[in-house]
C-alpha cells in the first residue's frame, strides 16, 4: 500500500474515532489517489470501497416516505452487487434505532429485491440469525428482528411460514414477554394472515384465547394486550393495513418471495461487510453497469412517456408555473416563513421545506433554494435572541448536497458585504447562525472566509461585530482548541490570510497585521494572534523603520524645501557646502548635519542642531538660510 493510501486510511480512522479531519484535505487526497492509481491497485479499490460505503449510508439515512422513490434510484446507481453487505448492515442498524421506520425500510428492500434477489435473501438470513441469538439469550429486543420480518412478509419478500413458526415458538411456553412480542407481531401481520393463511391465523387466536382463560401465570398487562388484539381483529385491523398506499411500490408479479424456515441453516456472510481485493474489478463493474442499465433504462423510458403525455395535456399549466412573477415570489416566501414558524422540530421543518420544490426543474429548484436559504436567515434575524433551531435547519440543508453547500457559501458572502444594513440584534443572530454552520463543519471555511480582509479600510464597525459573533459562537460549540486546529490547517491558512495575515507580510502591510492583532485581542481571542505577533516581531529592522517613517510622513503638513551648493577651490584643497531649509505648518523645528563627529545641543525653543566639520561639510536647517549670490529660493505652493 502506498504512502497516499496509508495516509488516507489513517485520516479515516481519525475521523471515525471522533477527531476532526479537514474535509478539504480528505477530498484532495482522494483526488490524488484517483488520478495516480489504476483500478487493479489495492489503494484505488480501497478508496472506491470507502466512497461506496459512505454513499450507501447517506442514502439509507435520508430515506423517508416522501423520497423513497428517489432513494431507490440513487441506490441502484451504486454497485449493490459489491456493496450489498454494507447496504444490509446499514438498513438493519437504522431500523434497530427506530422501529417506526421499519415499514419504510421494508418497502425499500422490496423494491431492491424485485431486481436483485440476493439483497432480500441476505437480509432475511441475517434477521433470522439475529432473532435466534437474542431469543436464546432471552433478550426482549428480538422483537425488532421479528417486526422487520413481519413487514417483509407483508411486502411478499418472505413467505409467511417463518413468522408462523416464530409465533408457535413464542406461544409454546408463554411468558409475559413472549405474549407481548406475539401480540405486537399479530397486530402487524394479522390482516395478511387472515387473507392468505386462514387456518393458521385461527389456530393462533385459539391458542391466545386458551392462554387468556386458563393460564394463571400471566399478569394483568398481558391479559389486557390479548383482549385488545381480539378487538383489533374484530375491527378488521383498520389501524394496521398490510401495506400503506405510499409504500406499495412493487407489483405482485415482479416480487421475488423467499421461502425460509426457523430452523434453516443460513449464513450471515459477514465477509461482505469488509473490503476484499477484486482481481477482476473492471469486468465486475461492467457487468453491474449492464444490470444498472436494465433496471434504470426501463424506468427512464416510462418516465419519459408519462412526462410527454402530461406535457401535452397540461402545457398551459407548465407555462404558468415557469412564469415566476413577483406575486409568486412573495407567495413562496410566505410559504417558507409559515413552514419554518409552524414546525415543531428542525427535522420536520427541513422535511417540509424540501417538499416545496419536489416537482420543479433543476433551474427553478436552485433559484427557489436560494430564496429559501435567505428566508431562513431572515427568520433567524427577527428573533429577539438567537435560536439553535435555525442553525440546525441550516446545518441539515447545507449537508444535503453540493448545490445546497454552494448556495450557503454565496449567501454568506452576500450577507457579509451587506451586513451594515442590519440592526445590532439581527446582526448578532446572523453571525451566530453562520458561526454554528462553521463550527459544525458543514460550511467550508476556506471557501467562505476568502472574501474577508480585516483592515481598517476594508471593514466597518458592522462587519467587525459580525466577525466577532461568528467566532464567539464557534468557540461556544467547539472550544478554542478546536478552533485553533481548524485555523492551522494548511488549506484554511492559505484562504484566510486576509483575516489572519501570517504569510507574505512585509512593511507595507504591517499596519494590517497590527490591526488584526488588536481586533482579536479586543474581543478576547488574543491566543489566536500569537503567530501574527511572531511574524510582526521578526520583520527586518529596516522594514519596521520604514513602515514607521511612511506612516509618519502621511501625517505631516505642508513643507518647503530648498537646497544650495557652493564650491570653492584653492591650492590643494576642495570644499563643498550644502544647505537645506524646510518649513512646516508645525510649531516644532529641527536642524541637523551629518558627519563623523557629532555634537547635540537642545535649546528651550524646542530646536535641535547638529554640526560636523570635515573636508566636506553639510548643514541642514529648518529655518530659512542665507543663499549664495545668484541662487534662488523655492517657495511653497
Curated annotation (Swiss-Prot):
The keyword DNA repair does not apply. Residues 538-637 are annotated as: Disordered. Residues 331-453 form the MI domain. Keywords: Cytoplasm, mRNA processing, mRNA splicing, Nucleus, Spliceosome. Residues 577-593 have a biased composition (Basic residues). It is found in: Cytoplasm; Nucleus. GO terms for cellular component: catalytic step 2 spliceosome; cytoplasm. Gene3D superfamilies: 1.25.40.180. Pfam families: MA3. One of its GO terms (molecular function) is RNA binding. InterPro entries: ARM-type_fold, CWC22_splicing_factor, Initiation_fac_eIF4g_MI, MIF4G-like_typ-3. Residues 548-576, 614-626 have a biased composition (Low complexity). GO terms for biological process: mRNA splicing, via spliceosome. Residues 53-236 form the MIF4G domain. PANTHER family: CELL CYCLE CONTROL PROTEIN CWF22-RELATED, PRE-MRNA-SPLICING FACTOR CWC22 HOMOLOG. Belongs to the CWC22 family. Associated with the spliceosome. Involved in pre-mRNA splicing. This is Pre-mRNA-splicing factor CWC22. It comes from Debaryomyces hansenii (strain ATCC 36239 / CBS 767 / BCRC 21394 / JCM 1990 / NBRC 0083 / IGC 2968) (Yeast).
Amino acid at each position: 500500500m502506498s504512502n497516499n493510501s496509508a495516509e488516507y486510511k489513517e485520516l479515516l480512522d481519525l475521523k471515525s474515532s471522533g477527531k476532526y479531519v479537514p474535509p478539504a484535505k480528505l477530498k484532495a487526497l482522494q483526488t490524488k489517489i484517483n488520478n495516480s492509481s489504476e483500478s487493479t491497485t489495492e489503494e484505488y479499490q480501497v478508496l472506491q470501497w470507502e466512497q461506496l460505503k459512505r454513499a450507501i449510508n447517506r442514502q439509507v439515512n435520508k430515506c423517508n416516505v416522501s423520497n423513497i422513490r428517489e432513494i431507490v434510484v440513487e441506490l441502484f446507481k451504486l454497485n449493490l452487487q459489491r456493496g450489498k453487505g454494507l447496504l444490509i448492515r446499514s438498513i438493519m442498524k437504522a431500523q434497530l434505532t427506530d422501529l417506526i421506520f421499519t415499514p419504510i425500510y421494508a418497502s425499500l428492500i422490496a423494491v431492491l429485491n424485485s431486481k436483485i434477489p440476493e439483497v432480500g435473501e441476505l437480509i432475511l438470513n441475517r434477521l433470522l440469525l439475529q432473532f435466534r441469538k437474542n431469543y436464546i439469550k432471552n433478550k426482549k429486543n428480538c422483537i425488532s428482528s421479528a417486526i422487520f420480518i413481519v413487514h417483509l412478509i407483508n411486502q411478499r419478500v418472505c413467505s409467511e411460514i417463518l413468522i408462523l413458526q416464530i409465533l408457535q415458538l413464542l406461544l409454546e411456553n408463554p411468558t409475559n414477554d413472549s405474549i407481548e412480542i406475539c401480540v405486537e407481531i399479530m397486530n402487524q401481520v394479522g390482516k395478511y394472515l387472515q387473507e392468505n393463511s386462514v387456518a393458521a391465523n385461527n389456530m393462533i387466536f385459539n391458542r391466545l384465547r386458551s392462554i387468556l382463560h386458563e393460564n394463571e401465570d400471566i399478569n394483568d398487562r398481558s391479559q389486557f394486550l390479548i383482549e385488545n388484539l381480539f378487538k383489533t381483529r374484530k375491527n378488521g385491523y383498520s389501524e394496521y393495513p398490510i401495506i400503506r398506499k405510499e409504500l406499495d411500490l412493487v407489483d405482485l408479479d415482479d416480487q421475488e418471495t423467499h421461502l425460509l424456515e426457523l430452523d434453516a441453516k443460513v449464513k450471515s456472510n459477514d465477509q461482505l461487510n469488509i473490503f476484499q481485493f477484486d482481481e477482476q474489478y473492471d469486468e465486475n463493474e461492467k457487468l453491474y453497469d449492464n444490470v444498472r442499465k436494465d433496471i434504470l433504462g426501463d424506468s427512464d423510458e416510462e418516465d419519459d412517456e408519462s412526462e410527454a403525455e402530461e406535457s401535452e395535456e397540461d402545457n398551459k399549466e407548465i407555462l404558468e408555473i415557469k412564469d415566476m412573477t413577483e406575486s409568486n415570489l412573495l407567495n413562496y416566501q410566505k410559504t417558507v416563513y409559515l413552514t419554518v414558524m409552524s414546525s415543531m422540530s428542525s427535522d420536520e421543518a427541513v422535511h417540509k421545506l424540501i417538499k416545496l420544490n419536489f416537482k420543479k426543474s433543476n433551474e427553478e429548484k436552485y433559484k427557489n433554494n436560494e430564496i429559501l436559504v435567505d428566508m431562513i436567515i431572515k427568520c433567524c434575524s427577527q428573533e429577539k435572541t438567537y435560536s439553535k433551531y435555525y442553525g440546525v435547519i441550516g446545518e441539515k440543508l447545507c449537508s444535503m448536497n453540493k448545490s445546497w453547500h454552494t448556495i450557503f457559501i454565496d449567501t454568506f458572502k452576500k450577507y457579509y458585504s451587506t451586513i451594515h444594513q442590519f440592526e445590532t440584534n439581527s446582526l448578532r443572530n446572523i453571525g451566530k447562525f453562520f458561526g454554528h454552520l462553521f463550527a459544525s463543519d458543514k460550511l467550508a471555511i476556506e471557501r467562505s472566509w476568502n472574501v474577508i480582509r480585516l483592515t481598517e479600510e476594508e471593514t466597518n464597525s458592522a462587519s467587525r461585530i459580525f466577525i466577532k459573533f461568528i467566532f464567539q459562537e464557534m468557540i461556544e460549540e467547539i472550544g478554542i482548541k478546536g478552533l485553533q486546529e481548524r485555523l492551522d490547517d494548511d488549506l484554511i491558512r492559505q484562504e484566510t490570510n486576509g483575516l489572519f495575515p501570517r504569510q507574505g507580510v512585509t512593511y507595507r502591510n504591517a499596519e494590517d497585521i497590527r490591526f488584526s492583532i488588536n481586533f482579536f485581542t479586543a474581543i478576547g481571542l488574543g491566543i489566536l494572534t500569537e503567530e501574527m505577533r511572531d511574524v510582526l516581531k521578526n520583520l527586518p529592522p529596516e522594514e519596521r523603520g520604514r513602515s514607521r517613517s511612511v506612516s509618519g510622513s502621511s501625517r505631516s503638513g505642508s513643507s518647503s524645501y530648498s537646497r544650495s551648493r557652493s564650491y570653492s577651490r584653492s591650492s590643494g584643497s576642495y570644499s563643498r557646502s550644502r544647505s537645506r531649509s524646510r518649513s512646516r505648518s508645525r510649531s516644532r523645528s529641527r536642524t541637523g548635519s551629518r558627519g563623523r563627529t557629532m555634537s547635540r545641543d537642545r535649546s528651550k525653543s524646542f530646536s535641535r542642531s547638529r554640526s560636523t566639520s570635515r573636508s566636506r561639510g553639510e548643514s541642514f536647517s529648518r529655518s530659512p538660510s542665507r543663499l549664495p549670490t545668484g541662487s534662488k529660493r523655492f517657495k511653497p505652493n
